[in-house]
């Protein structure tokens, strides 16, 4: 049976979007579709279906088949997809999207037929950051850990000689994090932080919305930033804006882009 799909990305963090109730998908199918040589290629798959208490439901699969609790870039893409399906003229669309981390409120600025939208999301509360010292062969590193619906660990001021591609996966799978964690290296810039992300179940990505929120929350805890003030997080794929409100909610703003549509020959 054939299955239509759409390809989206948020600052290069790319997804295959399927409107289907079939969930969860088998791991082997997710890995095959996300394979960049033998499949469509993506960091993950977004499943969109109806929900009785929201405009849609989003379920996320990472490229390895695992299922994260939340995905900020994926949520922006789903919100854009749903808004564009409902509206064909320039407008601001308020939506509620159900996720494994609860129902999230989104505001989508669309301008058809532009393939890009600006999306603002209230991701809800972050947990108060906690310092964990993690020993690895290279060093003992002090990380700030928090949750934005999914787990994150943030290292500020990483030493320049600390190899990200070696150290980040060690931290992401360290026994101190029984469920694994997303890892961010954050370096101060003139207007925010430069952030590199190792996503649990994916690896290095060009952008991660919840990681940007985790860095913003950790920055306030560390005294680098303040509540209720927008922070700019510079990821390899581009900037995201995050505001942590005085009550701890993370407000994420950034683009979502529709790349192309297609049909899976067999599903």
Give the location of each predicted region.
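Short, solvent-exposed secondary-structure boundary/capping segments
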Residues: 114-124
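Short, charged beta-turn/beta-strand-edge "cap" motif at the junction between a beta-strand
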Residues: 125-126, 239
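Short, charged/polar, Gly/Pro-enriched secondary-structure boundary elements
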Residues: 127-131, 259-261
């Amino acid at each position: 049976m054939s299955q239509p799909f759409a390809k989206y990305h948020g600052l290069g963090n790319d997804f295959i979007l399927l409107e289907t109730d079939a969930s969860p998908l088998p791991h082997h199918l997710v890995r095959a579709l996300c394979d960049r040589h033998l499949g469509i290629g993506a960091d993950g798959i977004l499943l969109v279906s109806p929900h009785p208490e929201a405009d849609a439901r989003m379920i996320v699969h990472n490229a390895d088949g695992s299922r994260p609790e939340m995905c900020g870039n994926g949520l922006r893409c789903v919100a854009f997809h749903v808004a564009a399906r409902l509206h064909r003229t320039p407008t601001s669309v308020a939506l509620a999207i159900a996720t494994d981390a609860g129902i999230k409120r989104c505001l989508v600025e669309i301008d058809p037929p532009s393939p890009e939208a600006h999306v603002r999301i209230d991701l809800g509360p972050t947990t108060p950051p906690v310092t964990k010292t993690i020993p690895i062969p290279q060093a003992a590193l002090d990380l700030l850990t928090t949750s934005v619906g999914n787990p994150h660990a943030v290292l500020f001021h990483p030493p320049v000689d600390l190899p990200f591609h070696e150290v980040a996966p060690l931290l992401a799978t360290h026994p101190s994090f029984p469920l694994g964690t997303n890892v961010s290296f954050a370096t101060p810039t003139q207007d925010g932080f430069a952030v590199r992300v190792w996503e649990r179940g994916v690896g290095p990505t060009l952008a991660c919305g919840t990681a940007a929120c985790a860095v913003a929350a950790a920055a306030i805890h560390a005294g680098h930033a303040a509540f209720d003030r927008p922070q700019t997080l510079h990821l390899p794929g581009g900037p995201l804006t995050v505001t942590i409100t005085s009550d701890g909610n993370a407000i994420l703003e950034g683009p979502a882009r529709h790349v192309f549509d297609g049909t899976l020959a067999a599903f």
